[in-house]
C-alpha cells in the first residue's frame, strides 16, 4: 500500500485495455481482399458448417472473417469490408463481413433485420 506522499510523487498507473479487434487499428471498418473462402465447424456443443473467409487487409493484416446470412457470392480475390465482432463458437474468428458493400452482395429475400444483411426493402405486392 503506497503512502500519500508516494501517490503525490508518482500517482497510479492506469491499466491499458487490450483491443478485441487489433487489425482494425481503431477504425470502424477495413477493406481487404479474400485469400481463401471456406467452411469450418464450431466448438462443442454446436454443430454446423460456418462460412468464413481469410482476408488480407489494406494495412497488411491477415484475419479470418465470418460471413453472416444465408448464401453468399464471395470467392478468392473478392474485395470486402470487415467490421469488428467475434463469433463465440468459432475460435480465432474476431471479425464480420459487412454485407451489401463492395463485392459482398446483401442477403436475398431478407425481410427482417435487413440493415444488418445489406438487403433492400421488398417491393409491396398490390
Swiss-Prot record:
Top-level taxon of origin: Bacteria
GO biological process, one term: translation
Keyword Nucleus annotated: no
Residue ranges of the region described as Disordered: 1-26, 102-126
One protein family per Pfam: Ribosom_S12_S23
A GO MF term: tRNA binding
Entry-linked CDD domains: Ribosomal_S12 (cd03368)
Assigned GO CC terms: small ribosomal subunit
Assigned keywords, A-Z: Methylation, Ribonucleoprotein, Ribosomal protein, RNA-binding, rRNA-binding, tRNA-binding
SUPFAM superfamilies: Nucleic acid-binding proteins (SSF50249)
Oligomer and partners: Part of the 30S ribosomal subunit. Contacts proteins S8 and S17. May interact with IF1 in the 30S initiation complex.
The name this protein goes by in its record: Small ribosomal subunit protein uS12
Species name: Burkholderia mallei (strain ATCC 23344)
Encoding gene, per UniProt annotation: rpsL
Amino acid at each position: 500500500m503506497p503512502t500519500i506522499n508516494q501517490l503525490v510523487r508518482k500517482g497510479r498507473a492506469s491499466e491499458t485495455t487490450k483491443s478485441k479487434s487489433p487489425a482494425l487499428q481503431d477504425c470502424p471498418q477495413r477493406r481487404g481482399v479474400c485469400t481463401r473462402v471456406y467452411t469450418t465447424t464450431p466448438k462443442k456443443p454446436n454443430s454446423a458448417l460456418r462460412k468464413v473467409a481469410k482476408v488480407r487487409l489494406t494495412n497488411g493484416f491477415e484475419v479470418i472473417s465470418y460471413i453472416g446470412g444465408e448464401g453468399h457470392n464471395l470467392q478468392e480475390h473478392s474485395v470486402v469490408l470487415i467490421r469488428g465482432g467475434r463469433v463465440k463458437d468459432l475460435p480465432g474468428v474476431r471479425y464480420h463481413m459487412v454485407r451489401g458493400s463492395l463485392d459482398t452482395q446483401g442477403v436475398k429475400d431478407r425481410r427482417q433485420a435487413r440493415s444488418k444483411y445489406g438487403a433492400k426493402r421488398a417491393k409491396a405486392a398490390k
